[in-house]
């Protein structure tokens, strides 16, 4: 009986964490003090995170710090959280493309910030902040695509794993350089990479600090497709066309599908099935459902 109660409590907690907007992985009970971390990150300016929301339901999130290969400053980390919160509340949204400015994705963390945050406590605080942010990003009810142009290094490579899909241009490369910096991935990249390519391939990629060109990344299942163009504008257009095939339909249906997949990935079977039931209740008998039934009825006559 006690074992059953413990499992039920654990399940409901996981569901709450997965679906309640604004909840994070870490809190003060884990030694994480978000406001203090924000004050620290604010001391490291540079660059920006830009968000453009299109009428077709596709958002374009741009990592914009081209003088440093779009490395994340402390301020950019804060802005990323702000954009994630904005996207959580974008009810018309269906898809999202993440890219870097000036035809390169991101080189990870800004070394100026890294040098100033030299203690294990500093490292773990930033780790928890970025794990919180990228987990919320991963759970967005939007189908997300990382458009990898140029280099995705370190934390930039980790960010690509928080997206549902990855597309590369012919000349682009992904590299988890953490071992050469004397650390391991800390923005959730290891956990997500294992899910994407399996533990054996992930161990090779991480321990070898392998330079994954577009061909190799495609072969191991890291990316879905290699685009035809390396041009910044043309490759973005290609990525938009690629994404459109998965977001055709009403926002409420696309968003429910993404939430259902997140549940299947993160929850125990019983809880995932219950959540699937609840999500079905948000679309069954809705406008899109009734319209589709009416159309099918016409075809059957």
UniProtKB/Swiss-Prot annotation:
Residue list for modification N6-succinyllysine: 211, 295
Protein keywords: Acetylation, Cytoplasm, Lyase
A cellular component term, taken from the record's GO annotations: cytosol
GO annotation, biological process: fatty acid beta-oxidation
Signal peptide: none
SUPFAM superfamilies: ClpP/crotonase (SSF52096)
Catalytic reaction(s) noted: (2S)-ethylmalonyl-CoA + H(+) = butanoyl-CoA + CO2; (S)-methylmalonyl-CoA + H(+) = propanoyl-CoA + CO2; (2R)-ethylmalonyl-CoA + H(+) = butanoyl-CoA + CO2
Subcellular localization: Cytoplasm, Cytosol
EC number: 4.1.1.94
GO function terms (MF aspect): carboxy-lyase activity; methyl/ethyl malonyl-CoA decarboxylase activity
Modified residues (N6-acetyllysine): 211
PROSITE patterns named among the record's database cross-references: ENOYL_COA_HYDRATASE
Primary subcellular site in the record, as a coarse category: cytoplasm
Physiological role: Decarboxylates ethylmalonyl-CoA, a potentially toxic metabolite, to form butyryl-CoA, suggesting it might be involved in metabolite proofreading. Acts preferentially on (S)-ethylmalonyl-CoA but also has some activity on the (R)-isomer. Also has methylmalonyl-CoA decarboxylase activity at lower level.
Family: Belongs to the enoyl-CoA hydratase/isomerase family.
Identification of the protein by name: Ethylmalonyl-CoA decarboxylase
